[in-house]
Amino acid sequence: MKYLFLIIMLFTTSCASLRSVEGFDTLRLKAGNFNLAAWARITKPGKPLRIYVEGDGMAWIDRRTPSADPTPGNDTVLNLAQSDSYPNVVYLARPCQYLPSDTCRPYYWTSGRFAPEIIAAEQDAVNQLMQKYNAPSAELVGYSGGGAVAALL
């Protein structure tokens, strides 16, 4: 029984940890009612940021079935951020990707992916990043649904 407890504890601990990305700092942002994951490579604090906004991720299993977790299945946007030579690059996940929140439910990565509270959370995250790195401005690069989020911000 104590081994079962240990296995469960190891599993839940690993689910809550974010992977490391070479050359990037791992960030957890509390934005609105959501937890957002971000990775940042900042070499010139006080200068503008370039923020890559993740797409819709794994929103659907098939045409009719929403996934239980919208975390992207591939690293396309993260790879774009990693290959960018700009001095201050941030990869910003969408709400409910990588990190759970009590408010996460399929609505937020399906029909509600551009709901006011989602856009407000992304705006809050961008503001936090700009403040943290003393950035006078931020350039948003959105991929797929992240492009719509960037445009709405």
Where are the language model's segments positioned?
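Short, surface-exposed "cap/lid" segments of acyl-processing enzymes
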Residues: 43-93, 98-99
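A short loop-to-beta-strand scaffold at the N-terminal edge of the catalytic core in hydrolase folds
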Residues: 31-41
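Gly/Ala-rich beta-loop-alpha elbow adjacent to hydrolase catalytic centers
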Residues: 140-146, 150
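Alpha/beta-hydrolase active-site loop
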Residues: 105-132
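Sec-dependent N-terminal signal peptides
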Residues: 3-12
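Aromatic pocket-lining residues of Rossmann-like dinucleotide-binding sites
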Residues: 153
